[in-house]
Every structure is written in C-alpha cells, then in structure tokens.
Amino acid sequence: MNIDALFGNKERITLGFFGGSITEGAGASENQFCYCQRVTQLLQQRYPETVFETVNASIGGTGSSLGAFRLKEDLLVHQPDFVFVEYAVNDFDTEKELCQRSMEGIVRQILNYRASCPIVFIYTLSDEMAKKYYDKGLIPQSIQYHQEVADYYHIPSINAGKPLYDTYTSQQLSVTEFLPDRVHPNDRGHEHYAQSILQVLPSMSFEIKYPKSPMQNNCLETGVMVPAKNYLASGWEYHPQSMFGRYPEYISSSQPGAKLTVPFHGSIIGIYHTIQKDSGMFSYSIDGKESTIFNSWDQYALQFDRACYFIPASDLDEDADHVLTIEVLEQKDEQSTGNMIRIGAFLMLE
C-alpha cells in the first residue's frame, strides 16, 4: 500500500509528528515554514480533495526515551492516521540498548493503538553527526540503531539529513547556510527536509509487520507518565498549573530534607521535571542503595525555562518491585537563584 491508497480516497487525514526540537519547528521563522507544516502543505497540494490536519507532539531537547513514556498522552489521544517519528539527532549520544528499547516502545504503542497505522522514521542532521560520520563515509550510530528497529517492523525510513549534507558539501557551502546553530534548520533547511521527504514518500510501500515478540524483551511498550502528585509528601506543594505546556500539573519543594518515596515495578524509572533559574539539586537512591546527587539546573536556565527529564536507572531487575527515594538538598549550583525542585510526573512501566 502506498500513500495514494492511504490518502487518495479519504475525506480527512491526521498526520502525527513525534520528535525533538527540529520536528517541533525550532529555527523556522514561522510555524508554517517548519518541515512538518511544509510536508502537510505539500501533501494537501497533492491530494486536494483530502483535508490534512497536523498534530505536532514534539518537544525540544528530548529523545525517544522520554517519547516512549509520553506518546499516549501527547499524540495517540489525537488519533493520528499516519505518524512520522524523528529522534536520531536527540538520540545521538544515547546508548544502543536504551535507544532501541525506547524506539521499539514507541512503535509497539502506535501499533497497539492501531495495527494498520503507517509509521515513517525520519532522520535529520546535526553538524556533529556530519563531522563524526558522514565526513568519513559512515552512517551515524543513532540512525543505525533506529534502522534496526525499523527493519524489524518493516517500517520505511527517510534520511532527510544526508541529502542536506550532500547539498552543502557539493556546493561548498557552510552547514550554517541551512543549520545556523549547526543543529536547528532555518526556513531554507526546513524546506530542504520537506522536499527530501516528499521526494521519497510517494514511492514507499507500507506493509508494516507486528511480530508478537519484541526485538528487545524489555522494550518500553508499556511506558506511562504517572502524576507526581500521587506521591505528594510533607514539604512538597501541589500546583494545578501547567508545566510549560508539557504536563498539566506539578509538585515543588525548596525545603532541604523534603523527601519523596516512589514505588515502581520494572527495569526503568524516570523523572519529568523542570529546569529554571532557581532550580536546585536533589539526591536520589533506588532500593536504599547509595544515593547520587542530581543537579536540575544547567547553563541554559540562564536563558529560558523548560521541561526536561532524567532517567536515574534503566537496567534494574525487570521482574522486581523497586523504590525510588528523592531528597531536596540545601546545596545548589552557584549560578542558580534557588534550590527549587519541580516535578510533573514519574516515568515508569505499567
């Protein structure tokens, strides 16, 4: 089945886009010029009798290991008919097992939602990927990891980054002509991505397979976000306000010694939190073992506030129950204006 069969006789199609900041539209002068909107516009031109809608559930600065936990709430609730997944740039430094567990978790959740839902993996570009791999005639490692998952499920993929690399290198242009900060495309870069996608998409065949057995036995197929308010304890305050539009609520504490106890089952636990000018540090331990300090402030907090995530552990006994303990610390980064900890949800397996 090709896109003519998928889109040609439909009254309405909802396209889902799921990825990081590139897919969210970072770098575009206006939303209409980001590659997702341009792909939608080009498909609308190709199929004028079909109404195309776009649901862009991408979040900048996040990889597939958060995506596997937020997919249901952020994208699948909108009932997409077709899903593009783009995480190769943000998964660039993610180790293979977690990367593939996450991407496979995303795939299986989509297929659990609708077994016939077409999926396409999109591979974009950063200058770091280009220098470490394409300059040497190699395929970026994260793309290799993603492609193994794609091959297992017969999911088609489009490398939109390599044609962009070929364009600026063959014309002896600087990468900044398309990626001004060497990661996020300007309008010209977004348009290049969109044209590359539409050049390949019509020739693709969608015959996705759904094996009963996952490629990774511990893939994140059952990943969910559990509200942090469920674990509210002394010294913490509940806020029904949105966490920068990324989560509908959060809890906070700046009280040194304030603790949270979070029981969970399975191999992985994550924390969906914020990074702000007044963010502090907390210690965490799992199953009463030695605690580790985590700094929820970074240098980008001086420029903007944002939602982020942290995975304290991903290789625990998958058949066992565990307990995560968090404690707010008095110490903080010297550039932070406070020691506030804000948490929207915990990432765990059902």
Predicted segments — roles?
Residues 1-58, 70-79, 261, 265, ...:
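Serine-esterase "nucleophile elbow" of acetyl-processing enzymes
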Residues 16-18, 24, 64-100:
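Oxyanion-hole/transition-state-stabilizing segment in secreted/luminal serine hydrolases
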Residues 18-20, 57-60, 86-89, 122-126, ...:
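Active-site-proximal beta-strand/loop segments in catalytic clefts of secreted hydrolases
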Residues 98-105, 139-143:
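Charged helix-capping and loop-helix junction motifs
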Residues 113-119:
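A short helix->loop->beta-strand "cap" motif at the edges of active sites that frequently abuts
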Residues 126, 130-227:
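Catalytic His-Asp segment of secreted/periplasmic serine-dependent ester chemistry enzymes
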Residues 191-350:
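Conserved catalytic region of serine esterases and O-acyltransferases that act on ester linkages
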